[in-house]
């Protein structure tokens, strides 16, 4: 009886401790970010097992002893650092914060793009609009704003976007070109990276990029620099959500990469309907995206789930990281049949290949 009670008490205390971590999470985030950006983690790592005292860290980084103390003690509380004989040493957590590209990309994205705007998450949820985007200016969505955002914010946004998508492109190309498409429509082409990889991979394909004019201007520059202007063309569209704005047609393949998650379910349905009209009779629709319910590792699902508030507060106010089953239903309701599903591309992407059918049913309804 006593043993059982003690065990329960420990569980309650642990739960309360975890709750405090959430309560203080913004403080910890900013302090640990400064440990990284002020090179405190770097000099501690370089010291190796002996570690460094506060005074030595201050001398090597130019940060005051007061500042070093404040930041290192927060790092200690979060298992970023450990202390022995007044010397701080890096833990495994600290190592990943300093050296892991995934962690760096995520931290920069959250700080530069999302942090201030997330203060207005409640407004965004109430209105269905990206209220947090107002910290940068007056736009309806972040996609319209991208070419106008401060350079550091742009850099963190594109690095985040490309870090995830770029890793999957080489894995996806064989699936696309095994079917030998001669023409491909890249919807949401962004900076043109996938289009460039397509024409490099296959000498016969012609790619049409469709996106907002501001995005295509950047893509056009990148393509011209690579010398592929004769095989990649642009199709600017001012409002992807205008259901009357038709897509160009007759394509052997239509490609959407990290695209549908940028929209609400109703908007996705409209986009899929128009994508169907863009396909040649035997054409294929390819959807490359990340679904948190198809991830092999818990860390991937965690990152994806907690990216959804970005879409709410900053991107458009009504989209999120979807479960696969939700997208599957929208695909079939739009008149497509799923031909194949391949998981594990790049950093946890799933590639869905679809063809049109007149008798589609939602298997997951």
Predicted regions and their residues:
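Alpha-helical subdomain
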Residues: 2-76, 82, 178, 185-365
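Conserved Class I S-adenosyl-L-methionine-dependent methyltransferase catalytic core
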Residues: 6, 10, 16-46, 59-60, ...
């Amino acid at each position: 009886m006593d043993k059982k009670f003690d065990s329960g008490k420990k569980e309650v205390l642990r739960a309360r401790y975890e709750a405090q971590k959430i309560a203080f999470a913004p403080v910890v985030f900013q302090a640990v970010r400064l440990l990284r950006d002020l090179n405190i983690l770097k000099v501690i790592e370089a010291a190796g097992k002996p570690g460094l005292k506060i005074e030595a860290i201050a001398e090597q980084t130019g940060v005051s002893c007061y500042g070093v103390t404040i930041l290192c003690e927060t790092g200690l509380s979060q298992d970023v650092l450990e202390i022995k004989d007044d010397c701080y040493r890096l833990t495994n957590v600290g190592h990943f914060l300093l050296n892991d590209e995934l962690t760096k990309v995520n931290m920069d994205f959250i700080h530069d793009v999302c942090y201030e705007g997330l203060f207005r998450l409640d407004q965004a949820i109430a209105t269905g609009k990206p209220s947090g985007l107002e910290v940068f200016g007056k736009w309806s969505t972040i996609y319209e704003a991208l070419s106008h955002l401060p350079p550091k914010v742009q850099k963190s946004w594109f690095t985040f976007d490309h870090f995830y998508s770029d890793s999957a492109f080489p894995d996806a190309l064989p699936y696309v070109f095994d079917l030998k498409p001669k023409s491909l429509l890249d919807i949401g082409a962004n900076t043109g990276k996938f289009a460039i990889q397509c024409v490099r991979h296959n000498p016969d394909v012609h790619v049409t990029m469709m996106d907002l004019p501001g995005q295509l201007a950047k893509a056009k520059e990148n393509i011209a620099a690579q010398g592929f202007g004769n095989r990649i063309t642009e199709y600017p569209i001012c409002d992807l959500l205008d259901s009357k704005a038709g897509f160009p047609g007759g394509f052997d393949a239509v490609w959407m990469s990290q695209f549908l998650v940028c929209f609400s379910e109703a908007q996705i349905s409209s986009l899929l309907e128009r994508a169907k009209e863009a396909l040649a009779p035997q054409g294929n629709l390819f959807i490359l995206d990340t679904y948190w319910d198809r991830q092999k590792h818990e860390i991937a699902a965690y990152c994806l789930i907690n990216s959804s508030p970005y879409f709410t507060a900053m991107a458009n106010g009504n989209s999120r990281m979807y479960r696969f089953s939700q997208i599957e239903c929208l695909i079939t309701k739009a008149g497509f049949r799923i031909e194949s599903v391949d998981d594990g591309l790049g950093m946890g992407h799933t590639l869905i290949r679809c063809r049109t059918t007149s008798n589609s049913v939602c298997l997951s309804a």
